[in-house]
C-alpha cells in the first residue's frame, strides 16, 4: 500500500475524511501523528485524478510528506505502478483540490435544495447542519458557501431563461 500526503484547504480535508470515513485504510491511531489514508474506489472521480496525476518522485523533492490529507494510491491491474508513480506535485494537488471542491459543492447544493423543497427546511439551517456533519465548523465560513450557492442558483436560473427564450425563437 503506497500512500501520498499533500496539503489542501482544511475544510475540504475535513469533508473528505467524513465523506469517506468507510474507506479509511487504517483507523487513526491516537498515539500517532500520521493521518489515516483514504482508499478510494475506481468509481470515484478523485481516484482517477490521483492515478493520472501521480508522477515518479523527483530527485530534488523531499521524501518527508507533509499535508492534511492522505490517500492510498490507485493500484490498477494495468497502468502506473504506485511504487514508482508516488508523487503528487503542487499543481496536481491544486487540480485534485478543485475536484474535491466540486464534489463537496454538488453534494451541498443538492442537500440544500432537497431540504428546502422536500422538507421545508430553510437554507441557513441546512447549511449549518451540513457544515456540522462534515466537521467543517470554524474551517469555512457558512456565509461564503451560501454566497457561492446563491451565485450558482442565479446562474442556473439565467441559463434556464436563455434556453427557454431560444426555444420560442
Report each predicted region and the residues it spans.
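Basic, short loop/linker segments at the boundary and entry of helix-turn-helix/winged-helix-like folds
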Residues: 86-105
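Long, low-complexity interaction regions most often at the N-terminus
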Residues: 1-88
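Short, basic alpha-helical nucleic acid-contact segments in DNA-binding proteins
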Residues: 148-161
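Short, charged amphipathic recognition helices of the HTH superfamily
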Residues: 114-134
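Conserved small/polar residues in nucleotide/adenosyl-binding loops
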Residues: 167-169
Amino acid at each position: 500500500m503506497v500512500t501520498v500526503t499533500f496539503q489542501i484547504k482544511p475544510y475540504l480535508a475535513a469533508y473528505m475524511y467524513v465523506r469517506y470515513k468507510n474507506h479509511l485504510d487504517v483507523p487513526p491511531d491516537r498515539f500517532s501523528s500520521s493521518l489515516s489514508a483514504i482508499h478510494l474506489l475506481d468509481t470515484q472521480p478523485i481516484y482517477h485524478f490521483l492515478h493520472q496525476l501521480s508522477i515518479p518522485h523527483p530527485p530534488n523533492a523531499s521524501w518527508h510528506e507533509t499535508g492534511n490529507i492522505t490517500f492510498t494510491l490507485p493500484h490498477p491491474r494495468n497502468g502506473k505502478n504506485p511504487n514508482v508513480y508516488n508523487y503528487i506535485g503542487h499543481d496536481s494537488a491544486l487540480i485534485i483540490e478543485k475536484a474535491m471542491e466540486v464534489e463537496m459543492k454538488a453534494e451541498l447544493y443538492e442537500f440544500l435544495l432537497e431540504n428546502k423543497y422536500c422538507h421545508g427546511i430553510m437554507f441557513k439551517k441546512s447549511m449549518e447542519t451540513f457544515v456540522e456533519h462534515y466537521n467543517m465548523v470554524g474551517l469555512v465560513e457558512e456565509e461564503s458557501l451560501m454566497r457561492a450557492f446563491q451565485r450558482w442558483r442565479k446562474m442556473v436560473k439565467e441559463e434556464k431563461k436563455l434556453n427557454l427564450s431560444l426555444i420560442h425563437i
